[in-house]
Amino acid sequence: MSKQPFSLVRQVLKAAPAALDSEQAAVVSHRGSPIVVQGGPGTGKTTVLVEAALARIQEGQNPDSILLLTYGRERASELRDAIALRTTKTMFEPLARTFHSLAFSILKMKAKGDPEPILLSGPEQESYIRELLHGDIEDGFKEWPEDLHKALTTNGFARELRDLILRASERGIDADELAKLGAQEGEKYWQAAAAFWKRYLNSMVMREISAQDAKLRIDPSELVSRASIHLRNNPDLLDQLRNRFTTIMVDEFQESDPAQRELLTLLAGSDLIICADADSAVGRFRGADPDGLAAALDPYRAQEVVLTNVYRSAKAVFAVGHDYVQ
């Protein structure tokens, strides 16, 4: 039996304006102070951001002064396309981008004398961690507990160790703090990982010193926090970005981590729209912090709108799911 040929067809983007309900329209027309938009899946939070961006562009605002932050490169690309399809204005910068893309662009805005930044890939970082672990094995396993000795030889352990460093960094926890927490909680693995983390950071510094290309290699776990530090150390650059991005919008804020929220706090002005749904966070595995969502939203609750109309799911199904989560 012959197989039927198939092709992957990209979803056709809609160029027509969305029909907004009264709650959505209130968000789109809001100006002058931060606004928090809450709503479940299918209530049109992302639609609100697209329409709010387009409304400002149609009023004459420079598209390059609007920054729409989201999670995932594919989602950012979809948002850029949805907006570009309905405006003829030229955009010199990506209007929608991820926090990591924004952070890297900030680090590329170097102060005088700063080296060119290069972002290490995940596989590069894991490979380097494996090299250091191999050295630990040759040195008699250093601080590693005996029940982890066999694990040190595996790729999976290097991957888990990298993930621990990522998650800790996103929460503003450094190696010293991790060691302290390990001692307080009686977590011997944390203490061993903290000691390794210090060796890892020291070896990264030595690599930078011995590198021939005079470029700054950035650990992915430090990317967003380094961008915040860079802005604090360069107040003129911070003022430049705050003046450039007069409107900031954030989609899926529940997927953010503490480092990303800190960067947003530095950049945000008065024209700020944040969309969130605490019930649908799916990124805990990569550092999302939905448990801290309410506290993170508090500084921006000058006005709050809850979207109640569901356009993508049956209302009964949505209600059952929401009640179950509650």
Predicted regions and their residues:
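Acidic, metal-coordinating catalytic cores used for nucleic-acid/nucleotide bond scission
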Residues: 71-76, 153, 309-315
